[in-house]
Amino acid sequence: MSDLMTTRALTTRDRADLAASILFGAVRVGLGLLWLHEGYVKLRAHFGSADILLVVDGASANSRVPEYFRFVAEHLLRPTADLAGIMTPPTEVTLGLVLILGVFSTLSAVVSAGLLAVYWSSDQLIAQYPIMALLSVGVLVGQGYSNRWSIMTLVRRRSTHQEEG
């Protein structure tokens, strides 16, 4: 990035890198905003154990839900419905904030894809989940570029600048 800060003309490669960093950074932030929204909606709706139990009961009666998820729902989610109900909204909000800030972006994209897989397995589909899945893949594909505009990079740049100055 320091090469881009000099007075020399940008090369085609510099322009491509800059464009990719803007694109994949926007993908990361967009995914973060969607997760932030998901968590916010659940917080406002007072999401809790009753919602988790609704998913568990729905999974046992729904032929579209895979057998492995029915097993997980009955033996893991049902006994921990209180904890899962409490933790789901803050998990989604935290995931959104971490992606927006660009902290642990690769891990966050994997967690995002994993949560979406769990939601899909339970047949809890909403319109933005396919978009969120594509954005999760986008963060993973562009991981070398998506963090150029992150809080961690800005902190590193600032400390490097202070050391030089």
Question: What residues fall within each predicted segment?
Answer:
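Extended, low-polarity transmembrane helix blocks
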Residues: 1-67, 71-94, 101-165
